[in-house]
Design a protein with these regions (language model features):
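A short beta-turn/loop motif at secondary-structure boundaries
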Residues: 35-37, 59-62, 96-99
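Extended, well-structured beta-strand/loop surface patches
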Residues: 6, 53-55
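Core segments of cupin and vicinal oxygen chelate
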Residues: 2, 9-50
Length: 122
């Protein structure tokens, strides 16, 4: 499995506050993606050349969820690997698909979350 990115993602109903906090810490907003899965907006923030954090606005979340965002070259391979290790997709087998990506949130048996994603290359 080839991993292409690895960084934290904060899924929250209060993205504006969290994005503002990271911007005050010196992170710069690189891009914003809207309409993910219908109503989620994701912000990619970068600090220098070394550090990234993603913040996703999800109004249906009762509280913040911090996960590890893992981008891979082969989504199906990584999804199957993680589910074979006991990770569960809380949405059943639902995969979020946009014109540029595929993603799913997977929860480990001990409760930590991985936001698995694949960036569709053109």
């Amino acid at each position: 499995m080839k991993i292409t990115a690895f960084n934290p993602i904060i899924v929250t109903p209060n993205a504006a506050e969290i994005v503002a906090l990271f911007e005050e810490l010196g992170f710069e907003r690189r891009h914003t993606k809207t309409g993910i899965g219908g109503d989620v907006t994701s912000y990619d923030l970068k600090y220098g050349d070394d550090f990234r954090v993603n913040v996703a606005q999800a109004d249906n979340m009762p509280q913040d969820l911090t996960a590890i965002r893992v981008s891979v070259r082969d989504f199906d391979e990584a999804y199957n690997f993680l589910t074979s290790k006991g990770f569960v997709n809380p949405q059943g087998d639902a995969i979020t698909e946009t014109p540029t990506s595929r993603s799913a949130l997977l929860i480990s048996p001990s409760g930590f979350a991985i936001s698995l994603s694949y960036h569709i290359r053109k």
